[in-house]
Amino acid sequence: DFEYVSSAKLGSAVSFYLAKDYKKAAEALQYLYTADPYSISLTAYLLGASAVHIKGSARLAPVFLQQALEHDSNNYAAVKLLASLAEKNKNTLQSWQYYATLHALDPQNERLAQKTARYQKELGAKAEDYLYYLRLETPIAARVESVESPTVRMALYGLRGQTAPAVLQAVKLVASGPARVQDEKLGTVKNVSAFQLRQLVYNPQTNAVDIMDGKGQVEFSAKRPFTFVLEQDDRTLLVRDAQTQDLFAADLSDKELKGSLTVIPQAGGMTLINTVRAEDLLPALLAARAQDVREEEALRALAVVLRSALLAEVETNPQAAYHITDNGEVFKFNGINLVFPKLLEAARQSAGVRLLNAASGVYADCGPLGADTITNTQTKPAYVFSPANAAKYMLANPPADLVSKPQDSTQWSGVKWAYWIDAKDVEERLSQKTKFGRLRAIEPLKRTANGRVLTLRFTGSKGEYVAQTPQEISFLLGAGSLRSNFFDVAPFYKGKNIRALLIRGYDTGLGAGLCLQGAQGLAKQGLNYLGIIKYYFPEARLLDTKTGKIN
């Protein structure tokens, strides 16, 4: 049986690897590397980690590690080892990029902070130019028709893993049409022509935000909120070159938006709130979540789910300063500059349709079983889905008729994934929470009926800690890199202490709601977007707000 042969080969390889017999480990891994597409990222990492210690093979290590990331960009261990190798080879730029990536995932880690600061200093003032941020000089979309719909307030530059926006020290704005600056008490204080650059800079001496022209001359200074208002609904505003005290607090990419932009001065800087019509925002939210989904009916289904969740946020908190951030778990906004025609069409053709009586969840990839017991296959497993059988599920390969199977047979990491984690990394993250010591045991305290982990207890030599949410579990185990809460853990001990962890898992997110790749597969089978929604939300009612009809 292929599944058990692969598992046995992996077990042999891990045994040799832990015994530091790296040549034999590499030999055992060769079978998996060529025969098992479901474990290729893990296999490539272990081959790279072994190559470091094999005489004459060290040059192959970065090749294998890059392959590990190509097949699974969440492979934290591969980035960590690449950082170490870049440092050893005295490659300042690569060291900075890899350590910056790790630091962004684990911002409270003092060791990573020191490494990042060291290489940032060596690179100089423009270190941020070497991060993977989108940069734009002028609006690209420039002119996009507006659709009448409820307004949404979205905070820009949302902090990673939080529900608050970053405090900015400076930002630049360029509008594709005429605009005005509106003070909440004084009214219009400045008119700005199309494509004229304006700089907003926090002045610590006055605790105000200065509005400057392209030459740096101050035109207006404000201590209270003011708003950039576009005079024409179909024009756009580019927000660029955002600066914060912490480079890693948020994704500081440039982004083009519709609607108005309110600037809120505060101690230490400013925050930005975009007020925009929901249907104008929706195509950009689709762009951030759709990934490689291109089937029109799948995109329409996603549009309905995101619209439903967005309007629910607005209706639940009508008086909130902002309803969402641009970097939340459900909603991500990278700018309307990334919208392509199919996304506009998906939003327009599903306009007015929303879900009732259903949680509007979305997740990228699904295995045979979702958290809500929705199946993505007609193949019946030889066991019952339960916490006791979670390990069997993790071992089993996806069925041939899985509706969410990837087009590329080597890119299975979203459906089935596996990570090697150094226990020292887990101990470092736990030490941020409590006095912990060495990792001794890991125990799931609460699971769902089919085995998803909800709470997890970590026992250390100096104390213990209970992670209370899937998000916290993912951070403590893998700095947020675990793809879902459907996994099992194999600990490897050295004496009383855990040395390393092998984590095997299925699907992404919490496994509830619309599975994007599943929707893609169902669309290819001929289901329209309403059929896809009924498949993933069988208890939901659909409301057409244009006609008032409920299905």
Tell me the role of every PLM-derived stretch.
Residues 1-41, 45-551:
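Conserved, single-site charged/polar hotspot
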